[in-house]
């Protein structure tokens, strides 16, 4: 049904976004001015990969092939991040906090219309971004 497909689409775009965030944060960590900040950004990257795995499991539990359902979102997400690549560490921090915060707020709002288990999955991922710990 349409609602089930919309749920899969939302989980898929969020999953691919988390995978891309892992890759992006791994690169951003290299821009850090000291080892402490590099470790903190790397920890965030690891968290994003954990979110990706949670979402992939959620997709599989709904009978979806994660790679297939994420495929339509790859190009637009990759293009967005390529066009907003940070030039230095301060720009990377702005993107981490502002951009990712806006995305998390958007996903939380859309999740209000999902079935309770799917909403809980999105909330779990968005609530555990860990950026405030940095």
Where are these regions (language model features)?
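His/Met- and acidic-residue-enriched segments that coordinate or traffic transition-metal cofactors
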Residues: 1-12, 39-42, 53-57, 105, ...
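Helix-loop segments that flank and shape redox-cofactor active sites
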Residues: 21-42, 84, 100-117
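Conserved alpha-helical segments that form or flank metal/cofactor-binding pockets of metalloenzymes
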Residues: 44-71
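A contiguous pocket-lining binding segment that forms or flanks enzyme active sites
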Residues: 108-134
């Amino acid at each position: 049904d349409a609602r089930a497909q919309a749920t899969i689409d939302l989980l898929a775009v969020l999953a691919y976004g988390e995978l891309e965030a892992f890759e992006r944060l791994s690169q951003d960590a290299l821009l850090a001015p000291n080892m402490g900040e590099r470790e903190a950004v790397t920890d965030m990257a690891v968290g994003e990969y954990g979110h990706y795995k949670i979402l992939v499991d959620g997709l599989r539990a709904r009978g979806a092939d994660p790679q297939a359902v994420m495929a339509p979102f790859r190009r637009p997400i990759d293009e967005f991040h390529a066009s907003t690549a940070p030039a230095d560490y301060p720009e990377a921090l702005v993107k981490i906090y502002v951009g990712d915060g806006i995305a998390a707020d958007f996903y939380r709002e859309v999740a209000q219309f999902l079935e309770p288990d799917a909403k809980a999955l999105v909330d779990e991922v968005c609530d555990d971004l860990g950026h405030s710990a940095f």
